[in-house]
C-alpha cells in the first residue's frame, strides 16, 4: 500500500505531511516552503498558477486570482455568507445548480474545482518529495463545517485524483498530533483560528485515545475578517481625505488586501507600522498615494469584537463538555491568526493560564492528518480517535418545526432511528426534509436535501408508522432513509445535492482535471524547451561574434538562417515543444558542422607547426 498523505486544506495556506519511519513530518513544496498559499490564478496566456506564483501576480490580475475559496465551499448562493463573500471578494461569484461558483473568462468553476487545483499541487509536491505516486489522503476541515461543506471538500479531493480515506476535524487532528505521546489522561482545549474559520474544541487525550467532548465555532470567522476590518478602515480614511472610494477599484482593493495582511503580521511583533501604497489611484489632479501609520492599539480596537466572539464560544463549548475552566490542563493554539497578540492575551485571560505554543500553528493540523492516515493504513496501532458531530441533525415536522434525531456532540460514526407518522387522513406520500442546525424552526436551519416516500396505504392520520434512520459515517457525512413499516417500502438519500454537484458532474470534473494536467505538462515542457532554445541561441550568437572572420561566409549564412528561424518560432507564444526542438536541432546541426570545420581547418596548421619544430631539432647525443 502506498503512503497516505495528510492535508490541511486551509483558507489562506495549505500544508501536506506524511508519516514515515515512526514520525509525522511536513513535506516542503517545490519552492522549499512548508506551506502553500491556497491561491489559484488564471493568466491571459491560458496558464493556471497555483500557490506562491499565483499570489505574486494577484495585484496585476485581481479578477482572475482566486483566494479564500474555502469561504464559499458548499454554500448555496442565497446564504448570507455567500452574499458577504460577493461583496468582499474581487472575483465574480455566481451560481451553479443553486450553489456558489465563480466565473473566469466566461467559464464557470465550482469551489471544488478551484480547491482541487490546490490539492493537485500538494499531491504533486508530495510525489516529488517521496519519489513515488500518491493517491490516498486524509483531508481536514473546520469542526464546525456542515454536511454540505464536508461533502464539497471530499469532492475536491476526488477531482484532484485523490482517494480521500477520511475527512477529519482540524482541532481533532491537531490534538492527535499534540496528544499522541501523552500517557496520562488530560483534558485540553484546541483553539483554532485560521484564515477563514474558527473552532474551539474540548478533548480528552491520553493512553493513545483522543476523544472529543464538545466542539463549536464559526465557519466564517478568521484572519480574513481581521484584514477586512483594516481594509475598511483604510478605504474609509482615504475616501474622507480624497473623495475616492478604493473599493470600486479591484486592483486598488487587492493592493489594500496585501497591505492589510502585511500590517497585521508586522503588528504581531511591532507596536507600530506604516502602510505605504504609492500611486494607489489617480484623479484629474494627478496620482494619489496612501500613507498611513497604524499602531497595534488601533488595530486591536478594530478587531476586539471579533476576538470577543471567540471567547464567548470558548465559554459555551467548555460548558457543553460539562467542565469548568480550571479542569482544562492545556490550551493548544492552532492556526496562523493565533499569532495576533490580542488573541493570545484574551484566551490566556479567559482560562487564567499560560498557553501551549509547543506546536507550529501552521503545520500541526497536517501532521495530525498524516498520523490519522497512518492509523487507517495500520502503521500506527492502538490509537482511537473519537470525534463528534458539531451540529444537530433532524427533519421538518408539522408546523415547520425541526425535530432533532441526532443531537450535536454525538460521537461519530453513529446511527439513529425515530418513528414518525402522517399529518393528514389517507396521506399516500411524505416528504422528508433533512435539516442541520440548532434552531427550533426549519426555516432557521440549513436544509441538506429532501426526498419523498410514496405508496403509503390509505389510513387515518397518525396511523402509518414511518421509520426515519440517520446514519453518519466517520467522515461526518450523512445518509438518511425512510421506511413504511407496514409495506416495507423504503427510500434513501445520501446527502449529495447539498454540495451542488451530481456524481456525473464530479466524474466529468475528474476527467477535466486530468485533461488540464496533461495540458499543463505540455505547457511546462514548452517553457523548458523555450528556455533551452534561448540559451542555445545566445551561445551560438556569442560564438559567432567571438570567431568573427574565421567563420566561412557560407557557414555564417546557414547559421544565421537557422538562428532567425529559431527566433521567429520563439516569438509565437503558442509554439509547442516539438516545434521549438525542431528548430533547435537545425541550429545545433549547422553550429556543430561549423565546429567540425573549424577543427579541420586548424588541424593542418598544427601538423605543419609540429613539422617545423621537428626540423629545428638536432639529432645528437648528449654526454
UniProtKB/Swiss-Prot annotation:
Keywords: ATP-binding, Chaperone, Nucleotide-binding, Phosphoprotein, Stress response. InterPro entries: ATPase_NBD, Chaperone_DnaK, Heat_shock_70_CS, HSP70_C_sf, HSP70_peptide-bd_sf, Hsp_70_fam. CDD domains: ASKHA_NBD_HSP70_DnaK-like. GO terms for molecular function: ATP binding; ATP-dependent protein folding chaperone; unfolded protein binding. PANTHER family: HEAT SHOCK PROTEIN 70KDA. The keyword Chaperone applies. Induction: By stress conditions e.g. heat shock. Residues 595-615 have a biased composition (Basic and acidic residues). Acts as a chaperone. The keyword Repeat does not apply. The gene is dnaK. This is Chaperone protein DnaK. The modification Phosphothreonine is found at residue 197. Belongs to the heat shock protein 70 family. Residues 595-623 are annotated as: Disordered. Signal peptide: none annotated.
Amino acid at each position: 500500500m502506498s503512503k497516505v498523505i495528510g492535508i490541511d486544506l486551509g483558507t489562506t495556506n495549505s500544508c501536506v505531511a506524511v508519516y514515515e519511519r515512526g514520525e509525522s513530518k511536513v513535506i516542503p513544496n517545490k519552492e522549499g516552503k512548508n506551506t502553500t498559499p491556497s491561491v489559484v490564478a488564471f493568466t491571459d496566456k491560458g496558464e493556471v498558477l497555483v500557490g506562491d506564483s499565483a499570489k505574486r501576480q494577484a495585484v496585476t490580475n485581481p479578477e482572475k486570482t482566486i483566494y479564500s475559496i474555502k469561504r464559499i465551499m458548499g454554500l448555496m448562493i442565497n446564504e448570507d455568507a455567500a452574499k458577504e463573500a460577493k461583496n468582499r471578494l474581487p472575483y465574480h461569484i455566481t451560481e451553479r445548480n443553486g450553489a456558489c461558483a465563480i466565473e473566469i473568462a466566461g467559464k464557470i468553476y465550482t469551489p471544488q474545482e478551484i480547491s482541487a487545483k490546490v490539492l493537485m499541487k500538494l499531491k504533486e509536491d508530495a510525489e516529488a518529495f517521496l519519489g513515488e505516486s500518491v493517491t490516498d489522503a486524509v483531508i481536514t476541515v473546520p469542526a464546525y463545517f456542515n454536511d454540505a461543506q464536508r461533502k464539497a471538500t471530499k469532492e475536491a479531493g476526488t477531482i484532484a485524483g485523490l482517494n480521500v480515506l477520511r475527512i477529519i476535524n482540524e482541532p481533532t487532528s491537531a490534538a492527535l498530533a499534540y496528544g499522541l505521546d501523552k500517557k496520562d489522561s488530560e483534558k485540553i482545549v484546541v483553539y483554532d483560528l485560521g484564515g477563514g474559520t474558527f473552532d474551539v474544541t474540548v478533548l480528552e487525550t491520553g493512553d493513545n485515545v483522543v476523544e472529543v467532548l464538545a466542539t463549536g465555532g464559526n465557519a466564517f470567522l478568521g484572519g480574513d475578517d481581521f484584514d477586512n476590518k483594516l481594509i475598511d478602515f483604510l478605504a474609509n480614511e482615504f475616501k474622507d481625505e480624497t473623495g475616492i472610494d478604493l473599493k470600486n477599484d479591484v486592483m486598488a482593493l487587492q493592493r489594500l488586501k496585501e497591505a492589510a495582511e502585511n500590517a497585521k503580521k508586522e503588528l504581531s511583533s511591532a507596536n507600530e507600522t506604516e502602510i505605504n501604497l504609492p500611486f494607489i489611484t489617480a484623479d484629474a489632479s494627478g496620482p494619489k498615494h496612501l500613507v498611513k501609520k497604524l499602531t497595534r492599539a488601533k488595530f486591536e480596537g478594530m478587531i476586539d469584537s471579533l476576538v470577543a466572539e471567540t471567547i464567548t464560544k470558548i465559554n459555551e463549548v467548555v460548558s457543553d463538555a460539562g467542565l469548568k475552566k480550571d479542569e482544562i490542563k492545556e490550551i493548544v493554539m492552532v492556526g496562523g491568526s493565533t499569532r495576533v497578540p490580542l488573541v493570545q492575551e484574551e484566551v490566556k485571560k479567559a482560562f487564567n493560564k499560560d498557553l501551549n505554543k509547543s506546536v507550529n500553528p501552521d503545520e500541526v493540523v497536517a501532521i495530525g492528518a498524516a498520523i490519522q492516515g497512518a492509523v487507517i493504513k495500520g502503521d500506527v496501532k492502538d490509537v482511537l480517535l473519537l470525534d463528534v458531530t458539531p451540529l444537530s441533525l433532524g427533519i421538518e415536522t408539522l408546523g415547520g418545526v425541526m425535530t432533532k434525531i441526532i443531537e450535536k456532540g454525538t460521537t461519530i460514526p453513529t446511527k439513529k432511528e425515530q418513528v414518525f407518522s402522517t399529518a393528514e387522513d389517507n396521506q399516500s406520500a411524505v416528504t422528508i426534509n433533512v435539516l442541520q442546525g440548532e434552531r427550533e424552526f426549519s426555516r432557521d436551519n440549513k436544509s441538506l436535501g429532501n426526498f419523498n416516500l410514496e405508496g403509503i396505504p390509505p389510513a387515518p392520520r397518525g396511523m402509518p408508522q414511518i421509520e426515519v434512520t440517520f446514519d453518519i459515517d466517520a467522515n461526518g457525512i450523512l445518509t438518511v432513509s425512510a421506511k413504511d413499516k407496514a409495506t416495507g417500502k423504503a427510500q434513501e438519500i445520501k446527502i449529495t445535492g447539498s454540495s451542488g454537484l451530481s456524481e456525473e458532474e464530479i466524474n466529468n470534473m475528474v476527467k477535466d482535471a486530468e485533461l488540464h494536467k496533461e495540458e499543463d505538462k505540455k505547457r511546462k515542457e514548452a517553457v523548458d524547451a523555450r528556455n533551452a532554445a534561448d540559451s542555445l541561441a545566445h551561445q551560438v550568437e556569442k560564438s559567432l561574434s567571438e570567431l568573427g572572420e574565421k567563420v566561412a561566409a557560407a557557414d555564417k549564412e546557414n547559421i544565421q538562417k537557422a538562428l532567425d528561424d529559431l527566433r521567429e518560432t520563439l516569438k509565437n507564444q503558442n509554439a509547442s515543444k516539438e516545434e521549438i526542438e525542431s528548430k533547435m536541432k537545425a541550429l545545433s546541426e549547422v553550429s556543430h558542422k561549423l565546429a567540425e570545420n573549424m577543427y579541420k581547418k586548424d588541424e593542418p596548421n598544427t601538423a605543419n607547426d609540429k613539422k617545423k619544430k621537428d626540423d629545428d631539432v638536432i639529432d645528437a647525443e648528449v654526454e
